[in-house]
């Protein structure tokens, strides 16, 4: 973009970087004439004012000179000591003269501006340069190989860098080295460049391209690499720029070719060594990257040659070009538009002529009628890459999850200047709240382990506040036996101490009541008792003594009973009793204030009369403890809690602990807490927290805590979450169910807590604390961000695919054979489509299995193995280690207790659910044994509806035997395995649908193979002979598959269609550690009706352990596809035609594994120097192909693939120790035969990477 313009045919020089404002000096060129053909010469200084919209630059000073100039430079000498405020202008003249000008005096308009001058050179001085380290040193070059070094402090006596070069020739340019101050280079038109060392005062090297003689027009040193320089060629036959390195001076390092005619001038940017300007006879100004020989930018210029070009030292984006058309143009390489400059030029032309006829008629010209043309705005493309001065050398930015992303541009070393600069981005985890994270980790550990008693006890011992200690004591009680009794002890009521007081009172150790002691003293003595339970004992003490210690002597036998029927009270009572009117007798006793007699009679009168009498008694009796006794007897504690003095809150809470029913306990404690919270006494308000803990009302606890505590600080919020989580687990333990939905206030606090955890990098923990049953926008947004950060976003959004139906295949079996019955755990049932047949349940987490369609299996989907299951299901749901959801799960999750979470179960990929495949008519199915229902009509569980979304489970294993006890049992026993005699199940949930166990040796007398005989031609006896007569070696669960001996071919039925080739893994190993234990029961096998054979179906079934063989067990006939293998006895099928097998591509979601592992091996190979280490790495690179094959075939379980993805992430973070920990976890929790081919290789690679520090 053109910024400014000077109408001069002149040599130019920019003011030094130390000078402000920016000036440009223009001296009349020696070998050129302007349009006026004037022979006058001048030296002018112009100011660069970019704020001025005018195109012309403002002239600040001018000096008429008798000299014309070949070269002009502006040095900073004298600026620092203010001797020369604007520096010194150094001019090279036509007659060998060098003139020093005071730039500040030229600007000021003084007439005496010359500091000094010399005519030592012979001929014109065409080369000048100022030393960048010592600004008082100036090099000049003239004719006859003259080179002088001038000291501006002593200008009269210059020195030479060494003897003149031979043969003598003109010096076209000189340049000081930008890195080493005593190195000077000079060049001559013949194309030779000489490098001088001023310390040695001698020439050290000559640079010349002997193969191509070029006319040198420019010389420039690399601003950063001391040994590199460029030479420009003016020859039209070779318009190139050669880049030389003095260390390899035999030939050019690079040749920059793009000009079509000779190059007149070059300039290397000091601010960015990757910017080199050149101008040539082809009217072009190019900006190069000399390191790559690429043209980064071409300036829009006129149709005239530019003979000089220079960078502005102060503003690195500005440059100037002097052209033969009499203009010095100022450009910016940052792009922009030239429309403004063009408009200004048009306006200037119009103002010059005005509206008067230029032919002298004096008449005003009419306006020019031109068609309106809307020309598009001309926009100049900026540089292809940002220049160095606007590139940030360093940068930092915070990212979600407490990550700090920093970058720095590493400067290339002098030894490797041609290499592209490395751009390093560091991603660091920043933890600012270390105490908060430490306590959060402790809580997380407790949630996983379930040791809440230990956690609460640790809190009691470590907290400093006495009230906090009391709170944690109350929370701890929830996890102990007989919680109410422990609550009473915390309130100060211990049974042992109370028993001692009562015993002392009964023995008469208490102060006896004197006859003259009035009622007031008695009450005062009772008030001295601290325990509320002692008060009714003291009131009832005379009754106790009268009834228990006083023996009533029997009436003398001679005394007759006198039943008075007089009209006094006794007589009326007697009459009422004689007639059986208990109620009247009780009323008379109460009227006569004979309370004891009335209550005794009411007991005999029945419960209704007793309750009525109790009410009347309490209405008449007014004492300190009458309300308490009334509440105890009437079991009505609501009135006590609503009216009691809040100073006696402990006594009221103790009474609730003792007498409240379980269903009303929580409400009563909450009522007392609400009264305490609304109290004006601050100390009483704090006690409301204890009541809410006893009540188990989490929302009230959160509301109270929010009002009284500073919940803005992370530690305060951590304290609240600790109490809430522990209390929720306590309520869950007490009620045996998941608590109610989370309220708005608690959801807000949990969202705030999850945000804090996420800001410290604990993303997995943070998402577990987010509520799942709230519609708050902030919660949903945070869940979205966390899901994306953890790679679970696609998994959360993908709906469940429709599950196709399967066809049943019935098989005949003897009725009297005892069977093992496998009870399959049933997931939560989802209504199925009416038209879809029943399918067996799936025993794996939704969204973690995928289908694999091979080219040989009639497009039969093969389910991936499921997530590993625990060996021994937990019998205690409360003891299970669950992820820290602390009762916040959805109801769908609540019915399936969780097992121990997989350590590295981050959702790396979302697999679609498994779809069952139904073979079409005439399609041979791959045989797989099916489970037999206990009765013919017992249907299998319905499949999930295609319209319902897949349940979203957290990354944990949802299998538990105790939770599925009600599942309908299914009997299963395929034909006996080779030499085993037990029930063997070929597969498991998500296991491959085809398999080929090694055939055993044939027993003597066996003549036929039942696998190759149609079902219609088999007999029970024949099948029994062939199936039970086979013996063979029994392999261990982890033995590799044995090589099968070639079997003798038998005759195949005429219309037999061979099954599809077997492409999936052979079979699950025996004793699969993933198989759930404790789920087999023995039941007698029921008779299955014989039905016609149907096509084979593909049903995932559970693997069974081998049992002892009973040779006497009879065998039945089994219908199936012709040639379908029976049990384990599967013989080779027809020979498959040989064809070329091409490997399938690795799935796109797993390509990151290959890229990461191979990239790490390449880094290790680069860093390794030991041949033995390199051999190990080469071998590892080859053996990893086994892993890639398994990825292609998708035969690895999701748990192993998840671990591999976590390992790849640790490699990308260069955390090899974590990668080795993940490796150990995968090996210890997976099938050995599944991982033995590649896991040792990965361990070698990780160990070497950690050792080499790559």
Curated annotation (Swiss-Prot):
GO biological process, one term: COPII-coated vesicle cargo loading
Cellular localisation: Cytoplasm; Cytoplasmic vesicle, COPII-coated vesicle membrane; Endoplasmic reticulum membrane
Keywords: Cytoplasm, Cytoplasmic vesicle, Endoplasmic reticulum, ER-Golgi transport, Membrane, Protein transport, Repeat, Transport, WD repeat
One GO cellular component term: COPII vesicle coat
Bias kind Polar residues: ranges: 847-863, 872-881
GO molecular function: structural molecule activity
Major localization class: cytoplasm
Membrane topology: Peripheral membrane protein
Origin superkingdom: Eukaryota
Low complexity biased stretches: 364-383, 832-846, 1080-1091
Pfam assignment, any one: WD40
Region described as Disordered: 364-386, 818-892, 983-1008, 1058-1125
Residue ranges of WD repeats: 4-47, 64-111, 120-160, 166-206, 209-254, 258-298, 301-341, 397-428
Self-association and partners: COPII is composed of at least 5 proteins: the SEC23/24 complex, the SEC13/31 complex and SAR1. SEC13 and SEC31 make a 2:2 tetramer that forms the edge element of the COPII outer coat. The tetramer self-assembles in multiple copies to form the complete polyhedral cage. Interacts (via WD 8) with SEC13.
Role of this protein: Component of the coat protein complex II (COPII) which promotes the formation of transport vesicles from the endoplasmic reticulum (ER). The coat has two main functions, the physical deformation of the endoplasmic reticulum membrane into vesicles and the selection of cargo molecules.
Family membership noted in the UniProt record: Belongs to the WD repeat SEC31 family.
Protein name: Protein transport protein Sec31A
